Amino acid sequence: ISDKILLDVAKITKKFYPNSVTDDFDVNVEQIENIQFKSKVKFGRNVLVGKNVKIGSNCLIGHNSIIETNVSIGDNCTIGSNVIIRNSLIKNNVHILDGCIIGKKGFGFFPDKKANFRYPQIGVVIIEDNVEIGCNSTIDRGSLSNTVIGKNTFLDNQIHIAHNVKIGENCIIAGQVGFAGSSV
């Protein structure tokens, strides 16, 4: 039937999720009234918020941060300055420090002699309760499944979590660590 089953699945998936290969940037300042947020949410200067965003109560979104499409942020969360988040479910008491990028597409390619094919990234990032993510860390959204950071986990600065990675509960991970795609 096919000697490149994963490549064929990727091509079929792309047809159903055409925007999963390119990050369409549809964030607009005027959309801020369309978001759903509870009481006591504070926004820093130059914050942009996209479509389908929910923000819980007692949250702080730092200066110059971008909350793109399809993001849900729980209660008592802090998003630092210069953070970009998209396609993510962030639960309660989560602290994302300055400069992080959460939920962008991962590094998923199928090599082919004609041309490399980017695998669609249709999963999300799930960050469980009581998590802290250090400065300048990156967490890719899942390709066909989700990327998950377990409860009570602390990530130091400059950590990279690739697509589909599952980090367990109560983990403490030191700086400059990288997890390759689909690691558990």
Stretches with model-predicted labels:
Residues I1-E33, S39-G44:
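Short, basic phosphate-binding NTP loop
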